[in-house]
Amino acid sequence: MKPKFKLAVVQIRTETDKEKTFAKAEKMISEAAENGAELVVLPEMWNCPYSKKYFHAFADSENGESREAMSRWASENGVILVGGSVPEKCGDKLYNTCFVFDENGEQIARHRKIHLFDVDIEGGVRFKESNSFAPGEDITVFDTKFGRMGVEICFDIRFPELARAMAKRGAEVILCPAQFNMTTGPRHWELSVRARAMDNEVFFVGASAARYEGFDYECWGHSTVADPFGMVKASCDEKEQILYCDIDLNEVDSVRRQLPTFLHLREDIYNVAK
């Protein structure tokens, strides 16, 4: 039998006051752990408003404030902490980066967002993330006491090859910290979470920030967890809150027995993910 565990998505509303944001994050992670969560997921840019004018000011260098805090929160609460993402300064470059810490506070993974959000949607959102960040270069999978997992960040979800590559490397849970917006969120957010879960017969966790007003970029919220059949297992609205979901990894094997799509891959014809 494979493990069962409870996960929590901390759908936090980011503030311009960093101390206030950190205090909220610490409190919400502690609350999640007290309620039985063993894996806690923060959203994209949890420590920083999603705006070019804040990225450099809130950036973390190696052993920076955000990284130290996440390590401490993981160890103090005995949880695996998927640290959403923070602006990471490395040399003269800035990355949109997710750090993952085990229950002892040790860093076990780092994912730098591969696909940068450069869009200009007619009548909707305009953003050019590449004006601020450099793209990551690595597919990220990591082992936990529950099993192997993968992580991607927001716009990465639109590229199914990435999730497939993680699944082929053994990931049974894919975690996606994100901040979809008011243009793409209602159209594509739940659809994308369910599609990536169904495509790869994995649990897919879409961890959004809460909606906040007064910024140029307004977040959609609606954190969502989909099961290996592509059905919504847990979801919430746009407000600041903690979303809980019980995960049974035996469901992955069950679905793959019933619909053995990986056994029917025609890699003699196509091979888009290694």
Language-model segments: which ranges?
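A short C-terminal boundary segment appended to hydrolase-like catalytic domains
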Residues: 250-274
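CN hydrolase (nitrilase-like) catalytic-core segments centered on the catalytic cysteine
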Residues: 62-82, 148, 154-243
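Short, glycine-anchored, charge-dense loop/turn motifs used at functional sites
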Residues: 7, 100-108, 226-234
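Active-site catalytic loop in hydrolytic enzyme cores
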Residues: 89-169, 182-191, 257-261, 271
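Short beta-strand scaffold segments in enzyme catalytic cores
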Residues: 83-84, 97-100, 140-142, 223-225, ...
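Cys-nucleophile CN-hydrolase/nitrilase-fold catalytic domain and related Cys-dependent amidase chemistry
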Residues: 15-18, 27-110, 119, 180-200
